[in-house]
Amino acid sequence: SSAASDVYKRQIQKRLVKAFPNIETEKDAEQEEKFAEGCGFFKLASLFIIGAFIGDIVETIFCLITTGRLMSRSSLVFGQFSIVWGIACALLTWILYRYRDKSNWFIFLFGTILGGAYEYICSVFTEIAFGTVFWDYSKIPFNLGGRINLLYCFFWGFAAVIWMKAVYPFLSRQIERLPKKAGRIICSLLLVVLTADMALSFAALARYGERQEGKEGNGVIAEKLDEYFPDQFIEKRYENLKIAK
């Protein structure tokens, strides 16, 4: 019977541990060497980095197909990374991880609401922080202040289902295959580089907004930002950028 089989297996395991006491220690050590297990900091950080890169590439290809033009979709002044997509991947995973076994309809509805709220907040933040608008859905039906629209909210819902049911499980397995020490070093270094890039991009965009208001730069930092990130550079890097009215 099944019960007798389980008892028999436990007896064998106890005898093996007694005969070879290092078995359990080696098993625990092997488990400890697993990088970014579960849904902790390093898993979310890895998903942020991967999501930022893949999101930028996908959006670039999408724009090329729909507009016939190759334009930059990066959030940063250096590198091809979309911070909006990176944060979305990490945030979506963190919130929906506990519901990953729920039905597709549940994930879709949750993702639709969550994605719409996230995009709206991002739009408000960029307008307040930089005085700029990166997207405007005013010409699309069922929009809310041009910041979000119903169709794109549904896209967020579909993306949530695909992400939680297919993409996330695959990426999670690949991430966990990295050696623990090497994985933490690589992930930490990439986070430091991206953080520095984000800080520089934030400063460059803020200074761009000041220039549009006719404000003179004061200090060495403002002078360097004007020199290395002039209007021509910013407007080419962020082609959809508009000054908020």
Q: What residues fall within each predicted segment?
A:
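Interfacial segments of alpha-helical transmembrane regions
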Residues: K43-I49, D101-A117, A182-L189
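Membrane-interface segments at or immediately adjacent to transmembrane helices
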Residues: A206-K245
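Cytosolic-side transmembrane helix boundary signature
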Residues: F158-C187
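Internal/C-terminal transmembrane anchor helices
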Residues: K180-A204
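Functional transmembrane or membrane-interface alpha-helices that line membrane-embedded catalytic
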Residues: A45, T67-W105, T112, T126-K165, ...
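Cytosolic juxtamembrane amphipathic/interface segments immediately preceding
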Residues: E26-G40
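Short, small-residue-biased leader/transition segments that mark boundaries at the very start
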Residues: S2-Y8
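Transmembrane alpha-helix/helix-exit interface in multi-pass inner-membrane proteins
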Residues: D56, T60-C63, G116-A129
